[in-house]
Curated annotation (Swiss-Prot):
Its EC number is 2.4.99.28. It is found in: Cell inner membrane. Pathway: Cell wall biogenesis; peptidoglycan biosynthesis. It comes from Salmonella dublin (strain CT_02021853). Belongs to the glycosyltransferase 51 family. It catalyses: [GlcNAc-(1->4)-Mur2Ac(oyl-L-Ala-gamma-D-Glu-L-Lys-D-Ala-D-Ala)](n)-di-trans,octa-cis-undecaprenyl diphosphate + beta-D-GlcNAc-(1->4)-Mur2Ac(oyl-L-Ala-gamma-D-Glu-L-Lys-D-Ala-D-Ala)-di-trans,octa-cis-undecaprenyl diphosphate = [GlcNAc-(1->4)-Mur2Ac(oyl-L-Ala-gamma-D-Glu-L-Lys-D-Ala-D-Ala)](n+1)-di-trans,octa-cis-undecaprenyl diphosphate + di-trans,octa-cis-undecaprenyl diphosphate + H(+). Pfam families: Transgly. It is a single-pass membrane protein. Its main location: membrane. Keywords: Cell inner membrane, Cell membrane, Cell shape, Cell wall biogenesis/degradation, Glycosyltransferase, Membrane, Peptidoglycan synthesis, Transferase, Transmembrane, Transmembrane helix. The chain crosses the membrane at residues 19-39. InterPro entries: Glyco_trans_51, Lysozyme-like_dom_sf, PBP_transglycosylase, Pep_trsgly. It comes from the Bacteria. This is Biosynthetic peptidoglycan transglycosylase.
Length: 242
């Protein structure tokens, strides 16, 4: 009887280990490949596209146009850093003080959860993982974040992040967003336009760059102030991000 019980457990353990090993090889290969090759699509893009098809929205297209950092306005990278992760050039993928503050806040305010994800974590999640909040996904995200921080430069992380970020329904990447909302390439985005796009990033399906609410406008103004405090365009040059 004990042998019959042990055998299935052993099989499941081996199966789980093989799945994890296969995922590690797949994700490791992706990290290595995308360190030099443009990203054709992300896990979030695939998830949105499949969900649309399953919902009968066959006209939905998750659209993105890859551009290099040389073809992105320096204001755009600065705006995203100012809005999402001001310690981006300094940390190794995780902002530990911000995580500690978020945990303390969430213990006091369970109905208003605050995140502390860095740009590196967001990039790992958007590129390789599914939406949602679970300890499994967080654990995988942490491993992938360490992987991209080890293999990619900060400039590469920022480039990939800007190219796969969701800026609206079916709009992925800064080039597609610039063309849709401002009818210009990403290279010509102004300070205010870059700040407006960065302002919707916390929830681009709720906040609209083409119809900004009062909250989005106030966040845009705050981001512009933060951009000035960081040092403006010189911040990007000083940290070798453009």
């Amino acid at each position: 009887m004990s042998k019959r019980r042990i055998a299935p457990l052993t099989f499941l353990r081996r199966l789980l280990l093989r799945i994890l090993a296969a995922l590690a090889v797949f994700w490791g290969g992706g990290i290595a490949l995308f360190s030099v090759v443009p990203v054709p699509f992300s896990a979030v893009m695939a998830e949105r596209q499949i969900s649309a098809w399953l919902g009968g929205e066959f006209g939905y297209v998750a659209h993105s146009d890859w551009v290099s950092m040389a073809d992105i306005s320096p204001w755009m990278g600065l705006a995203v850093i100012a809005a999402e992760d001001q310690k981006f050039p300094e940390h190794w993928g995780f902002d530990v003080p911000a995580i500690e503050k978020a945990l303390a806040h969430n213990e006091r305010n369970e109905s208003r959860i605050r995140g502390a994800s860095t740009l590196s974590q967001q990039t790992a999640k958007n590129l390789f993982l599914w939406d949602g909040r679970s300890w499994l996904r967080k654990g995988l995200e942490a491993g992938l974040t360490l992987g991209i921080e080890t293999v990619w430069s900060k400039k590469r992380i920022l480039t990939v992040s800007l190219n796969i970020a969701e800026f609206g329904d079916g709009i992925f990447g800064v080039e597609a967003a610039a063309q849709r909302y401002f009818h210009k390439p990403a290279s010509r985005l102004s300070v205010s336009e870059a700040a407006l796009l960065a302002a919707v990033l916390p929830n681009p399906l709720r906040y609209k760059a083409n119809a900004p609410s009062g909250y989005v406008r106030s966040r845009q103004a705050w981001i512009m102030r933060q951009m000035r405090q960081l040092g403006g365009e010189s911040f990007m040059t000083r940290n070798q991000l453009n």
